[in-house]
């Protein structure tokens, strides 16, 4: 499995960390245009000072960079620079850079090591960990990819100081998700220190990141290729969220924002089907009530949407894999499971309406 390091500055002593993992000091460094501007000089200076041979690549900071055309351009640059299988790739950025960098590393010379240096809260707690790497296809997101574990995940909470508050809230959705599925004590800490974490205050921020990374890594270790259903529990709230993202044409609403809404609906569905008691439902809702959305987003992207339209998009999103929806639900706060049985559409629609009622009251 990957070695996950949470520290600041995380790039200190990078050469010794690479050598300890059998990695050569020959690194392709992938940035997007934003992370190059924010962190490029610091990262490249550290690598130069520690004796690395470096080839730098930069892609536009947008979802469209996760494409075959971008990948081919990067392959060409690496080939022309003489990059061979003795090199590794360091991905410096959020989910787009991490996915694209992982995809390039998994496919170049049939696979070179990848090191993730995530710069967003969402990437630090979710996408950089677990080895799922992919690019998009015109027919859907993340359809072309690999399981390719990073050798190292280097997490520096101080990098989050550059994030807009909206991105912090978006990343916190995944942190809260880990509490819902695996750690009720984490939920209690989040409830007590939510505003401090949003403000990036220590030690609360690092505690939340470290515990989230531990949970994700433990789940991946037990079910790397999603064979047992355990890894599927990481998708709590995501069935609803994917429908919302699809309705928005994968624009306008952040992934974490959609997951926050989806978790509210999944909590309600867990209660409707008799798995979750009312006090637990209300405790879970009290945490979700802490989230803030951009002005008008909640109304336009959820409250004004007909529940049947959302359900239709949820179904179309899953028809590529099977003929029915699969829901991750809760038996208790901190205890998730994958429901194998079909769920009556009326219950799903009811859960969507419950979530709308909840958010209207906030």
UniProtKB/Swiss-Prot annotation:
Catalytic activity: 7-phospho-2-dehydro-3-deoxy-D-arabino-heptonate = 3-dehydroquinate + phosphate
Cofactor annotation: Co(2+); Zn(2+); NAD(+)
Residues reported to bind NAD(+): 95-99, 119-120, 132, 141
Cited NCBIfam families: aroB
Reported function: Catalyzes the conversion of 3-deoxy-D-arabino-heptulosonate 7-phosphate (DAHP) to dehydroquinate (DHQ).
PANTHER family noted in UniProt: 3-DEHYDROQUINATE SYNTHASE, 3-DEHYDROQUINATE SYNTHASE, CHLOROPLASTIC
Protein name: 3-dehydroquinate synthase
Organism of derivation: Chlorobium luteolum (strain DSM 273 / BCRC 81028 / 2530)
Upper lineage: Bacteria, Pseudomonadati, Chlorobiota, Chlorobiia, Chlorobiales
Gene that this sequence comes from: aroB
